[in-house]
Amino acid sequence: MPQLHDSGSRAIQPSDQTHQHDFARIFGIETEYGVSVTDIPEPMDASHVAMTMFQPVVRRARSTNTYVENGSRLYLDVGSHPEYATAEAICPSDALLSDLAGEQTMRSMGLDAQRRLRESDAQNRHATLHLYKNNADSAGHSFGCHENYLVRRFVNLDMIQHVLLPFLITRQIYTGAGRFDGERLLFTQRAAFVDETVSSATTRSRPMINTRDEPHANPDDYRRLHVIIGDSNRSQWATLMKCATTHLVLCMMEHAARSGCETELEAFALADPIAANHAINTDGAHARIALAAGRSTTALELQQMMLEQVESFAAHHGDALEASLRYDALCNVEWIVGQWRWVLDRLAANDIETLSHVVDWASKQVFFNRLQSRGTVTPARLRQLDLDYHDIANGRLYPSLCAHGLMRTLVDADQIHDAVSTPPPHTRAVLRGRFVAAASHTDAVYDCDWTTLKLVRPVHMEAVLLDPFHDEPTKQYDKLMGELGDARADGDEAPV
């Protein structure tokens, strides 16, 4: 059984491969889910629903905080939000696939909990469990979807605040998931709840970027960029694009910091990021935002100017950028830039119908418009449909859109099924997943976090996995796995 602890990742010695001179990156997505149960005689508290989901996990792991055999972290966050943090991914498409594997894992847990609720009490025989991959509940509480990017340590926080934030805020015109607030469809789920730009706190405030220094890698080489401004997407395209476009912008920043020059994105610093965020939430691509330099522009125009700079950078550094995406099965630099240009052109043309096949808020808008054209639709019904779109357990709207070719998908069910139990390749997730899978079939007591694997009993032994890019076993790791093999053999030979 596992025991969990958090590692500060403070290294004594450097990693073998620091990737300080290339653009290789580690990606990760953390998703908190909302839960509720309907069709029961008495209301059920969300925390009780969440604990019901995690009962099998607790029986197996003796904790609501564990790692699974694909290397990802599964846990019950503060309050009543089940959370899934994907294992380290080497490219955007692996991050997408890992995120969808988390969705499938949560769905299976939710439907299993629903079955047990129905069987536990005749009054609950029609219980329906809802598991929402969104960022706000009907009571106005917000929960997050956080992106993680491994960034070279020489990229300072000032550059992140003044260069990256304008991009992150304005990318929501095509990555926003949309939220019906009772009167209108807003463009994002999360923007209304963000009240700070950059901060190390997440409990007292909701910053756009969290600066708590937990790289889960060699801290002399890297920092972990923890992006909080962003929505939980159902659209596979939106998830892929938010990771892929952010990667290209980060590559520009790293090159500038490495070379001691500017990125050409400094001119786009915002006068008031919070105000810009709120404006985009209500007005989308055409929201007017003030720049620190004194002029104003629209969110769409700012994205267009940023894309031009990225295209120019890619023209001069194409080989290095392509090398950073060499393992990506879905996208290369040309595809990312082409899709970026395409979506901005569709936004400029106000072509919501075409956008609805890949952009979550546009998909909702088109569907809502069709309903309203057929007759009166109440705000309560639209709110219900908005939630249904994000319900991965019993929702019907999003699966129906996919089945009818109205929402584009990039990976199939078989790939997602395999990713539930298979770690993303080319990262230390391979080693962690192999360790967890082996340990879970023994009576050994083991300990696990992002950088350390540890046996507690029958022997005390650990292996440190500090380099997230390293997927080859070390001597420490081989010795650890050997002990697990012995423990499994001893268990097999034990008398019944």
UniProtKB/Swiss-Prot annotation:
Keywords associated with the record: ATP-binding, Ligase, Magnesium, Metal-binding, Nucleotide-binding, Ubl conjugation pathway
Record InterPro entries: Pup_ligase (IPR022279), Pup_ligase/deamidase (IPR004347)
Active site: residue positions: 77 (proton acceptor)
Keyword Magnesium among record annotations: yes
Nucleotide-binding is among the record's keywords: yes
Gene Ontology molecular functions: ATP binding; ligase activity, forming carbon-nitrogen bonds; magnesium ion binding; ubiquitin-like protein transferase activity
Residues holding Mg(2+): 30, 75, 83
GO biological process, one term: proteasomal protein catabolic process
Signal peptide: none
Task of the protein: Catalyzes the covalent attachment of the prokaryotic ubiquitin-like protein modifier Pup to the proteasomal substrate proteins, thereby targeting them for proteasomal degradation. This tagging system is termed pupylation. The ligation reaction involves the side-chain carboxylate of the C-terminal glutamate of Pup and the side-chain amino group of a substrate lysine.
Family membership: Belongs to the Pup ligase/Pup deamidase family. Pup-conjugating enzyme subfamily.
Extra remark beyond the main annotation: The reaction mechanism probably proceeds via the activation of Pup by phosphorylation of its C-terminal glutamate, which is then subject to nucleophilic attack by the substrate lysine, resulting in an isopeptide bond and the release of phosphate as a good leaving group.
Name listed for the protein in its UniProt record: Pup--protein ligase
Higher taxonomy: Bacteria, Bacillati, Actinomycetota, Actinomycetes, Bifidobacteriales
Gene: pafA
